[in-house]
């Protein structure tokens, strides 16, 4: 499934560290995304592809207790997110009671410094969204709450800059009878493919008006304003590369120039053309994804005849990055992050 050399190489691989990186390392990483700094990019690129896992097994962390991961388990998750922006966890001893499971998920997230939950309209009082087929109510008609395929995207691509989603957790309570597979790609791998093809493609996607999501009227009558911003940007709070993207053809407006159109086409080709570093996973009960808002999609699924046994995935979106140092469970946008970086 994946092509990199699984052996890490000295100085290059040392750019990838678990937990909170030092300011110097953060600076080295942000320098790598400067189109004028080719040496820094080449060093980072070598480290990334050398350290990148070759298959799903390299992403998996087994947990004994979802609510209380051990220091070693926590470290293993941070290491995988440090290298691939993603970890797959497996906890077969978790709670079966829905309320307890939701409490355990919050505790698990907090153990990894994920505390600032997005204030999503479909979330419960605890900030967790139940992704399941909804035939009525405010969720009806939205693709995530159907059994239809969900195209490639990053979470919260329609949010404004003050509510940018930096991380999310998907936890499987019940799988579908058939289908419901996720495909996942680290945005940094997409960045590498684009920049290696032509740095001008990256420049186009870093333009502050590269992608516009038009205004939308929510089911409760509230109007979500237009979101205009880049596809790739350096997050000023973390100095890490972040991405906002959707492969949808409706309700998305690309900047009207040849470079942006070419970049959008090439990016879609990466996602649909057999990229070897795309991971595919069909979560089983007790398994989940924890990531720094990676690109992902979902195949169509069938629940079978018993609706109460249908696919149920709990989703938590965070304004924090995995392993970040924020504190306090906030749901309001940060006024200091009210604009997209230029």
Label the model's feature ranges.
Residues 82, 86-127:
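Long, mid-chain structured domain cores
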Residues 4-69, 80-82, 126-283, 288-289, ...:
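Active-site environment of non-heme Fe oxygenases that use a 2-His-1-carboxylate facial triad
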